[in-house]
Amino acid sequence: MSAFNEERVLGVHHWTDRLFSFTTTRDAALRFSNGHFTMIGLRVDGKPLLRAYSIASANYEDHLEFLSIKVDDGPLTSRLQHIRAGDTIIVGRKPTGTLVVDYLLPGRRLYLLATGTGLAPFMSIVRDPETYEKFEHIVLVHGVRKVDELAYHDLLVEHLPSHEFLGDIVSSQMHYYPTVTREEYRNMGRITHLVESGRLCADLGMPALDPAHDRVMICGSPAMLRDLEHMLEQRGFAEGNTSIPG
């Protein structure tokens, strides 16, 4: 059996000239946990050209969704950015990853801290009803350079809170905090500074980050991951994995 499925592109949305998302069909046998990533790509000269992409859609949806940057000289993204509805892409059969709520210890508040396309796995997690059963508050922070890079802003602000099944719990438990670094906006600053200064929690009316009650997931640039990991470790947070919850 092949390690990949061929899926048909259903739609493509170009957020900016550097950012796009797309949906595809989903093989009925594909199973994944919200927060997982999988290998996706295109066939080039008869061979698969693949990269790891987080799945932005929830695991109960009948389609798959992915969020991607555009890199003109990127081996895959230089081609992927030109896909259209009806095109075929390759999707791995074995999604995996550690950004899964089940790998966290119980807590009161879940912080999801993302920069850029690091938002993708958290879009899956905030659409999962079980997330709201495990935590009283879910704080989704998305840091970008410019306002138009706030992908899924309207979905998070308007559509999810009015969702037929998720609307009530999203409205009462999810706190969306978009922040911008290079343009004027209601929230400004890098996530690392917002966390370190205490401004993030203050703006949200939340207590200071506390490993006794708070759980944190981070996804984004290597520099952001490194800085936040160090910052959180200094505050007493312990990194979890598939065998030891954190």
Please describe what each predicted stretch is.
Residues 121-131:
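Histidine-anchored nucleotide/phosphate-binding helix
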Residues 115-121:
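Ser/Thr-glycine-rich phosphate-binding loops at phosphate-binding pockets of nucleotides
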